[in-house]
């Protein structure tokens, strides 16, 4: 007797979520850009004892760091990608990413940034305490995993 298709599909999704699929090169470059930008913002804020702002798509000026994305990577969450479980009941709806403000005390304005390339997506979640959570959406398994 053959197992039902839904059981096979669920088994396939479970196995696929455990495989170490690498990020596509444009999203890998974007992830590195985000991590470098955040690290630099925290470092500059602590060193100069003043607030630093990390902004998407803006020109860098004094006290402001600009984040540029590689070609093909776009801001926002695609419609067919669900919110991560940690944001499901947060009331977050999306839209353009707002600037992240980092203070010298290693605190930050809580914020969420989504970016995507095709069907793959990244979610950068920054808490008030300054802790960073970076998640990726894996379309094959339909789930968010730590990046």
Residue ranges and their predicted role:
Residues 2-147:
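N-terminal helix-rich module
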């Amino acid at each position: 007797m053959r197992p039902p298709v839904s059981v096979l599909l669920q088994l396939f999704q479970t196995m696929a979520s455990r495989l170490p699929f690498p990020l596509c090169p444009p999203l890998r470059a974007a992830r590195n850009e985000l991590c470098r930008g955040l690290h630099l913002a925290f470092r500059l804020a602590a060193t100069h004892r003043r607030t630093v702002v990390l902004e998407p798509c803006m020109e860098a000026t004094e006290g402001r760091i600009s984040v540029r994305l590689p070609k093909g990577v776009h801001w926002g969450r695609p419609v067919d990608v669900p919110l991560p479980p940690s944001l499901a009941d947060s009331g977050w709806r999306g839209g353009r990413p707002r600037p992240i403000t980092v203070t010298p005390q290693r605190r930050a304005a809580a914020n969420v940034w989504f970016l995507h390339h095709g069907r793959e997506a990244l979610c950068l979640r920054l808490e008030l305490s300054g802790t960073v959570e970076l998640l990726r959406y894996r379309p094959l398994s339909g789930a968010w995993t730590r990046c």
